[in-house]
């Protein structure tokens, strides 16, 4: 088995999908998790205005709406959370995403004071924080807020990790990579876009340039620039297609580099890192 085949196997990616079938599969998955854990009544998800959180949010709201009706239990709620750092440049996109999702509840927590306070505390201790590292603090602070909300509201936190993100390790360890449930896992970027099209999302929500937008000194830095490879190449690779040797080497480099992010903390019994 080639490395490409092994990665595809691990991430469960199909070469082609039926968007309607994948929507139903994700909604049923989200419903089943709450049914199994009867002490949970809500899903919590940060909404940025990008493709991934828009799709995960819509699927979550659909699942909660069905559960609420089927169980005749109004306690089932989907809580969308806006988590800007100061003023978000593409706030209009975030509002457009919320209008499309139509969540039961929307909360806004501005993380700027918490992030800046942490950076200042570290600097006071003599630890200078790089702009890149500060970006990771932002991602982790967003998850602190989401878990605080979930803890108070009998909730589980939804993550937006999908195959094109997982293969490159393009997420913050214990930041956006930390969640309870991943409804998009198995889908690549273009497949997620296909689901949003079927769901009737505004094209602007899935045609915009993907960006983590975590660094102050590189606002709106495109994912593809940061990774050095296009999502088209990543998606093609995940669908078992041939791509250029340069693109393949870049993708596989990120796969190896990000292995530690796909595991729980390393124990003496683990050998994946050796």
Curated annotation (Swiss-Prot):
Q: Which reaction does it catalyse?
A: deamido-NAD(+) + NH4(+) + ATP = AMP + diphosphate + NAD(+) + H(+)
Gene Ontology biological process terms from the UniProt entry: NAD biosynthetic process
Residues binding Mg(2+), per UniProt: 52, 165
Q: Where is the signal peptide?
A: none
Please tell me where deamido-NAD(+) binds in this chain.
140, 173, 180, 260-261
The UniProt family comment states: Belongs to the NAD synthetase family.
The protein depicted here goes by the name NH(3)-dependent NAD(+) synthetase
* Organism expressing this protein natively: Streptococcus pyogenes serotype M1
């Amino acid at each position: 088995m080639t490395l490409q085949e092994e990665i595809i196997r691990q991430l469960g990616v199909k070469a082609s999908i039926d968007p309607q079938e994948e929507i139903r599969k994700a909604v049923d998955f989200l419903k089943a998790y709450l049914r199994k854990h009867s002490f949970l009544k809500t899903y919590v998800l940060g909404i940025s205005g990008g493709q991934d959180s828009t799709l995960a949010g819509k699927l979550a709201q659909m699942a909660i709406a069905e559960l609420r009706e089927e169980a005749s239990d109004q306690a089932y709620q989907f809580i969308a959370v806006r988590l800007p750092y100061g003023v978000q440049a593409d706030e209009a996109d975030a509002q457009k995403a919320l209008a499309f999702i139509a969540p039961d509840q929307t909360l806004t927590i501005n993380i700027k004071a918490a992030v800046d306070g942490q950076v200042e505390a570290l600097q006071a201790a003599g630890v200078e924080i790089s702009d890149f590292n500060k970006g990771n603090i932002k991602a982790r602070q967003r998850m602190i807020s989401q878990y605080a909300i979930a803890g108070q509201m009998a909730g589980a936190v939804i993550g937006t990790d999908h195959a094109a993100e997982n293969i490159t390790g393009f997420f913050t360890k214990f930041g956006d990579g930390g969640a309870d449930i991943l409804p998009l896992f198995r889908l690549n970027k273009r497949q997620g876009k296909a689901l949003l099209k079927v769901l009737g999302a505004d094209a602007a929500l899935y045609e915009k340039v993907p960006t983590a937008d975590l660094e102050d000194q590189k606002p709106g830095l495109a994912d593809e620039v940061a990774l050095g490879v296009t999502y088209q190449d990543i998606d093609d690779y995940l669908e078992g297609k041939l791509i250029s040797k340069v693109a393949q080497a870049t993708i596989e480099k990120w796969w190896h580099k990000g292995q530690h992010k796909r595991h729980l903390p390393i124990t003496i019994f683990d050998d994946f890192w050796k």
